[in-house]
Amino acid sequence: NIAVQYLVTGTADLDDVFRQNPDQFDVVISSAMDLQLKLTNDGFARQLPSITHPDWAQWRSSLFAFTTEPAAIALNTAAFDGLPTPRTRQDLIQVLRENPDQFIGKIGTYDVRQSGLGYLFATQDARTSETFWRLMEVMGSLDAKLYCCSGDMIDDLIAGQILVAYNVLGSYALGRADTQDTLTVILPSDFPTTMMRSALVSKSASSPDLAEAFVSHLIALQSDGAGGVFPLPPLVGAQDTSARASISLEPALMTYLDTLKRQTF
């Protein structure tokens, strides 16, 4: 019999905890692609040459992507009754600017100091378009609330504590039964940013063979399109960049992890 001990924490905390205790974990799964890539680059990941995976979805046979998921804008549906539903970031900027009294203190997004995924999304948004900084300026003027993770944002969105959640993971909102009539989830049509969730096996894993089998199982589930068994968005078709801006699994991701760049960002 095989037992799985599953530790859940934020992406930035996960990176810190694993770096300090690499022998305490067999598999590391995270949506923060840049942090995962740096762990691999720094020698924390075991090479698994027996796993066959597309070049664009793995790095050095040590880091393996197994889902893709776009960042979304989630809205409290009732709050937008009578207002145009924003389809782009510019649309959102316009709605917020024209209705400041309604949205002051009612916008949520990631705290990039706490969230590795939030920092990844923010840096990639900033690289893609100057619209991101205009949106951040508007959100800041409306006293946006900062969060560690998508789950907390969605909780407050459902409760009406916030009315807009920016860069939230859409599957988290759509996967909850209590959101169906409460939330509207939008993939921005201007440049929806898509991340790949990835897994690695610790070089110090106590059960490396079982860890490798687990990663192989994750990949197989997604490759087979077993959505009913594994409800996260599949990896298949991740490189169709015509409709969305996919974040590539490549060394350039580590650029914004430089201490000086992070401080200035």
Predicted regions and their residues:
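A structural signal for short loop-to-beta-strand junctions that line the ligand-binding cleft
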Residues: 23-28, 46-77, 105-106
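Extracellular/periplasmic juxtamembrane helices and adjacent flexible linkers that interface
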Residues: 208-209, 217-265
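Ligand-binding "clamshell"
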Residues: 39-51, 58-61, 175-187
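Periplasmic-binding protein-like
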Residues: 54-58, 69, 135-140, 146, ...
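Ligand-binding pocket segment of bilobal, Venus flytrap-like solute-binding proteins
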Residues: 105-186
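A bilobed periplasmic-binding-protein/Venus flytrap-type ligand-binding module shared by bacterial periplasmic
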Residues: 72-79, 121-123, 195-207, 226-229
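Short, polar/charged alpha-helical segment
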Residues: 1-3, 40, 73, 175, ...
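Early extracytoplasmic/lumenal segment of secretory-pathway proteins
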Residues: 1-38
